[in-house]
Each structure stands twice: as structure tokens, then as C-alpha cells.
Amino acid sequence: MPGKVRRIVTGVNAAGRSYIVSDTQLPTAAVAPGAPVRAGLWTTEGAPSSNKGTHDPVPDGVILYTPPAHRGGSVIRVTDIVPDKQHAYDPEDLKNRRCKTTPDRSAKHPGFHCTDTVDYAICLEGEIWALLDEGETLMRPGDVLIQRGTYHAWSNRGDRIARMLFVLIDAEPLDNHR
């Protein structure tokens, strides 16, 4: 089982000095049995976001929705993707997380989906295949994929977990995307 993720949050105190507001080990959670395990690190409701106060938008480390919950918002999370042979895809999972899917793409890979976001997908550990309608590429630690609202899926063809960092930023839907 994947380990917890350490999250350190900073702030400004009453004297105007920077300090550490919290330093916690966030639990990880699967949104569905056999699905990737996620730790939600932070979410914003819009841009610009407020840095005032000490409110924690994700105190339990769980962000269930893939796109930001608020127009103009953002999400950052760490996701541990198990090898494909251990992954039990639930067709309702993507729909429950507000992802778009199509039957023809699901036939290529059951995790094919798209969201109205710009995603920065960073491979931290392991290897993961990024699948698109036309083509695929292997990502290794340090590789970054800029996913711009396109249909895609993640395929872990290896024997160990692939740890990914995702930053999702709300975006306008693509007009010519079928």
C-alpha cells in the first residue's frame, strides 16, 4: 500500500512574519476499490486565490472530484497508480468524478477520459504510459506532461506503483473535441 504524503503549509502571522501553519502526513484514499490511491494536497476556489488566514481546504487529504469543484479553481494531488494487472476499473468511477468518457475510447482503455482542465502531470516514481487517441508515450521520473483537456488514460504496465503529481487548473471546454 502506498505511503502517506507529507504536506507543509506556510502562512503569515499577526506580526507579518512567515511561519509553518501545518506539517502533516496526509492519508491516502481510493475513490473506488482497486482504483488509484490519491492524496489531495490543496484546492483553490478561483483565481486569484486568497492567502489570508489558516483555512485548510483539504484537512483530510481527500479530493474526490477530478476537475476543480469551483470555476476558475485548481487542485493538486499525488496519485499512486497500481499496475494494470491489479487495477479493477469501475465504469461508474469516472462519471462520479465528473469526467467525460466515450464508449469507443473506453474500448481502447477503460480509464479513457477528459476533463475541462489544464493538467500538469509529473512522474515522481516508477513508469507510466500516457495514452491518447493517437499515440502514447512512456513517462519516467522527472517527465512532465501538459494535458490540455484531451481524452487520455494512464496505463501502468510495470510491476510497481507509479507515483504521479497532478496539478489541475480549470479551463474552457474544447469546441472541436468529440
What are these regions, as identified by a protein language model?
Residues 107-140:
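A short beta-strand-loop-beta hairpin characteristic of the jelly-roll/cupin
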Residues 8, 12-13, 17-22, 100-101, ...:
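Double-stranded beta-helix
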Residues 47-61, 66-72, 170-177:
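Non-heme Fe(II)/2-oxoglutarate
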Residues 71-75, 82, 129, 136-140, ...:
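Ligand-binding loop in jelly-roll beta-barrel domains
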Residues 25, 76-115, 148-151:
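Conserved short histidine dyad/triad with adjacent acidic residue
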Residues 143-144:
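Residue-level marker of beta-strand positions
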Residues 1-58:
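N-terminal leader/capping segments at the start of a protein or of a new domain
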